[in-house]
């Protein structure tokens, strides 16, 4: 919005030309989302407390979590608000990639909101019925994926980038839709599973978004894209603004979500952020890179799959409790230790992922 306005005002004052610089807009996008998040935090927490929108804690969970019962949840609303406002202010409104991310972000946020509402109002720990949750997540993911396929088939937009192999970029064709679906839905659920400890999900999300901001910048720059042997996508540059908005909103939320948390993001935040990371990876053709940089999310999800599969097939559990962060809690690790160590692992994985762009 402000970019469009600045383009009309630059003829009256050349200083408005600064709004055309991607790096400037990336920085102010981050700061805008950060300040909105920090401003909304106390007000959102007070409002959620007044409405008695408190966290519902399972009775079979770790005993240390019982003290979290009643902590305000659905704080993801402030994350989404900060991201959407910042992106609308600083990104080019005509960019289709930006709107793809916003559709998934808001759509998954609405699904998460309904899920949270059922939990906190009806005191139902299961929330929205699983089949309906996956149905609407699938509708959004398939809708966006199919639209992207129709717009970009037989172009670099539907190629698969394989880490370590610069000349291996198979054209996916219609399989692009299927891959995009699994990446978007899978990442949404993976972040949701990770959101079980104070600050555990938000910081890896910030790290991955920051990593994708660098990838988006390189992908949208023809010289750097050719240098790194990745597809050049002319619309990709504006995803930098989206990624930095996620970073800013995430850091602002962490101010209130750090241990001991004053507020939880709820499904409205975790599903939306996961879906956003998924669609960003799809748009940048970096699905494999997401698996590396988002390794914490992958491990959390695999721990649940292995736990359920092992119990059904052998009648035995692999972990003391899944997702795996609860396993370490039950081993006696203090919650802050689990959180910070997962953060460190996440940062390392993002750096490794970025390194794979050059090691090809």
Swiss-Prot record:
GO terms for molecular function: metal ion binding; phospho-N-acetylmuramoyl-pentapeptide-transferase activity; UDP-N-acetylmuramoyl-L-alanyl-D-glutamyl-meso-2,6-diaminopimelyl-D-alanyl-D-alanine:undecaprenyl-phosphate transferase activity. Keywords: Cell cycle, Cell division, Cell inner membrane, Cell membrane, Cell shape, Cell wall biogenesis/degradation, Magnesium, Membrane, Metal-binding, Peptidoglycan synthesis, Transferase, Transmembrane, Transmembrane helix. Its main location: membrane. Pathway: Cell wall biogenesis; peptidoglycan biosynthesis. It is a multi-pass membrane protein. One of its GO terms (cellular component) is plasma membrane. It catalyses: UDP-N-acetyl-alpha-D-muramoyl-L-alanyl-gamma-D-glutamyl-meso-2,6-diaminopimeloyl-D-alanyl-D-alanine + di-trans,octa-cis-undecaprenyl phosphate = di-trans,octa-cis-undecaprenyl diphospho-N-acetyl-alpha-D-muramoyl-L-alanyl-D-glutamyl-meso-2,6-diaminopimeloyl-D-alanyl-D-alanine + UMP. It is an enzyme of class 2 (transferase). It is found in: Cell inner membrane. Its cofactor is Mg(2+). It comes from the Bacteria. Pfam families: Glycos_transf_4, MraY_sig1. InterPro entries: Glycosyl_transferase_4 (IPR000715), PNAcMuramoyl-5peptid_Trfase (IPR003524), PNAcMuramoyl-5peptid_Trfase_CS (IPR018480). Its EC number is 2.7.8.13. GO terms for biological process: cell division; cell wall organization; peptidoglycan biosynthetic process; regulation of cell shape. The chain crosses the membrane at residues 26-46, 72-92, 94-114, 132-152, 168-188, 199-219, 236-256, 263-283, 288-308, 338-358. Catalyzes the initial step of the lipid cycle reactions in the biosynthesis of the cell wall peptidoglycan: transfers peptidoglycan precursor phospho-MurNAc-pentapeptide from UDP-MurNAc-pentapeptide onto the lipid carrier undecaprenyl phosphate, yielding undecaprenyl-pyrophosphoryl-MurNAc-pentapeptide, known as lipid I. Belongs to the glycosyltransferase 4 family. MraY subfamily. This is Phospho-N-acetylmuramoyl-pentapeptide-transferase. It comes from Citrobacter koseri (strain ATCC BAA-895 / CDC 4225-83 / SGSC4696). The gene is mraY.
């Amino acid at each position: 919005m402000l970019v469009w306005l600045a383009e009309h005002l630059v003829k009256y004052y050349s200083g408005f030309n600064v709004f055309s610089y991607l790096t400037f807009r990336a920085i102010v996008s981050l700061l805008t989302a950060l300040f909105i998040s920090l401003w909304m935090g106390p007000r959102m927490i007070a409002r959620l407390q007044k409405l008695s929108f408190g966290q519902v804690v399972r009775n079979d969970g770790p005993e240390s979590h019982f003290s979290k019962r009643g902590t305000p949840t659905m704080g993801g609303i402030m994350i989404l608000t900060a991201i959407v406002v910042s992106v609308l202010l600083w990104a080019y409104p005509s960019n289709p990639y930006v709107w793809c991310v916003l559709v998934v972000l808001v759509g998954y946020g609405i699904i998460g909101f309904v899920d949270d509402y059922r939990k906190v109002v009806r005191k139902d720990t299961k929330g929205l019925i699983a089949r309906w949750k996956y149905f609407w997540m699938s509708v959004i993911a398939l809708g966006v994926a199919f639209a992207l396929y129709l717009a970009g088939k037989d172009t670099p937009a539907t190629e698969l980038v394989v880490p370590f192999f610069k000349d291996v970029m198979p054209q996916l064709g219609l399989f692009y839709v299927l891959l995009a679906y699994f990446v978007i839905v899978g990442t949404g659920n993976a972040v949701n599973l990770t959101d079980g400890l104070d600050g555990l999900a938000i910081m890896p999300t910030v790290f991955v978004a920051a990593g994708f901001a660098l990838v988006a910048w390189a992908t949208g720059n023809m010289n750097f894209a050719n240098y790194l042997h990745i597809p050049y996508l002319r619309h990709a540059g504006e995803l930098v603004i989206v990624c930095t908005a996620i970073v800013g909103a995430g850091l602002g939320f962490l101010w209130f979500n750090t241990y001991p948390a004053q507020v939880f993001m709820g499904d409205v935040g975790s599903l939306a952020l996961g879906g956003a990371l998924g669609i960003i990876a799809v748009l940048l053709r970096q699905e494999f890179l997401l698996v590396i940089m988002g390794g914490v999310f992958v491990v959390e999800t695999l721990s649940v799959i292995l736990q359920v599969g092992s119990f059904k097939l052998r009648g035995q559990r692999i972990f003391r409790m899944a997702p795996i962060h609860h396993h370490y809690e039950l081993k006696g690790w203090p919650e802050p230790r689990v959180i910070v160590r997962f953060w460190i692992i996440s940062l390392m994985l993002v750096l490794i992922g970025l390194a794979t762009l050059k090691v090809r």
